[in-house]
Amino acid sequence: MLSWRARIAGGLIAVLVVACQATVGAPTQGARETEGTAPLPPAAVIPTPDAQTDQALVALARKKIRHIVFLVKENRTFDTLFGRFPGADGVTEGFTCDGAVVPLARAEDDSPGAAHSFQSGIVAINGGRMNCFDQLDSGHNLEGYIQYHPDQIPNYWAYAQTFTLADRFFSSSYGPTAVEHYWIIASQSDRFVDNERPLESQGGEGKIGDYCDDPLERAWSFPHFTDEEEREIYRLEEVPDVKAIRATWVERWPCHDIRILPDLLEEAGISWKYYTGPSPYLTVIRGIPHVRYGPMWDKVRSWEEFVPDVEAGALPSVTWLVPPAEVSDHPGYGALCDGENWTVRQLNAIMQSPEWKHTAVVLTWDDFGGFYDHVPPPHLDIYGYGPRVPAIVISPWSKPGAIFSETADFSSVLKLIETVFDLPALTERDANANDLLTAFDFEQQPNPPLVLEERECPPTDAVFQAGP
C-alpha cells in the first residue's frame, strides 16, 4: 500500500502545474481479468478505538449510544448545499478550468447534475486546484456551478443548525454511486472504480443490478498493482492524466467475497439491517455472495420497512438506510424537496421513538454529483478521497450548532460503529479514520428531538427518469 499522504486544510500542496486538457470519455478497452478477487487490504491498526482516542470519551460513547444509523443520500457537495452556512468553510463562487471566477448560481429544485464518475472526480479535482468541474460531461454549461439557498432546503439547514455539521467530510472515492456504496459497508471497493453494467461484448443489452445473479455483468476495476505501479497511478491522478489511468482498467464480474462491516456485527452478535430501494447502484451488497446467498440476506430489507420497524421498537443496533432513487436527492430522478421530505419522515420516526435518546444518525451524500466544491480532498491513495460532501451528525449527544472541521470520510462512520461496539477494523482506511467522537458531548444536556413538518414542494415541469 502507498504511504498515507494528505492535503492539510487551508494549506498548499505541490502539484505538477499543467494546462487543464483532461476530458472525460468512455474508457479504453482494457484486458479482461479472469483471476480471483483481491485479498482484503491489511488493516494498519487492528484494535479500535485507536490510541489517539480518549478512552474516557470512548467509555461514555459506549454507555450513551446503542443505535447508529448511517443515512446515505446522493450526489451533492458541501458547497452546493451548505456553501452559505454561517461559520462553515463554504464559498459562493468557484473557478473554472481556464481560471475564470464564476458565481455559484441559485439552484432550482430540479436542477440537473453533471458527470460524477471515478474519472470525473479526478478531472474536477485537477490535482488539488478544484477548478475543472466545467470539463465534465454535461458540465460545459456550468451545470455544476450552482448552490441552494437556505430558504430552498430549510429542513436540511434546520438539522445542520440544531445538531453538528461536518465541513471536512469527503467521499471515500472519486465516484460514482455504486463504488461509494462499497465503501459505506466495507471501507474499500475491492478495486472497482465504476458502476456495474451489462457485458459490453454482448452489446450492452440486459438488466443491470443483478451482480452475483448474472455472470454476464461487468464493472471497471483496477488490476492488481505492484507498489511501483500504484505509485505511478497516484502520480497520474495528481497530473491528472485520466486517459493513462483508464488504460489500466480491467473488466470484472461484480461478484466478489470481501469482508464487510455486517460480517463483524454478525460475529459479535450485534443486530443490523441494510434498508434500501430497488436501484441497482444502491444495492451493491448483492455483489457479496456470502451475503446474497446466505442467511445474512434476510437483513437486507426494503426501505419501506424502516419506519414501521422504528415504530415497533425494533431499531437495530446498526442501520444502513438508503432511499429509492426518486427521493435520493440524485438530480434527474426527483426534486430535492421531495428527497428532503423523505429524510424528514425517517428522522421524525427516530426522534419520536423512545430509542432517540440512545441514537446517533450520520446523514450524508454519497458522491459529488458533478457539483462544484472548493476544498481540495486529501489524496490518500489511488481511490481518493473524492470531493467534499455534507455530513450532519444528529443525536441527543452531538454538539448543538457546532461545525465539525476534522477530516473524515465514509470510513469514519464505520470507525464510529467499530469504536462504539468494540469491533476490529476492516481495512487500512477505517483503521486510520477519524471516528467522529469529538462531534459529540456525552455530558451535555441532551438535544431534544427536532420533529419537522414536511413542506409543500414547488411545482416543476421537469420530466424525471424512472429510478434505475
Model region roles, listed by residue range:
Residues 1-9:
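Bacterial N-terminal signal peptides that target proteins for export
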Residues 16-19:
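C-terminal motif of bacterial Sec signal peptides marking the signal peptidase cleavage site
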Residues 22-468:
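N-terminal pro-sequences and low-complexity stem/linker regions of secreted or lumenal proteins
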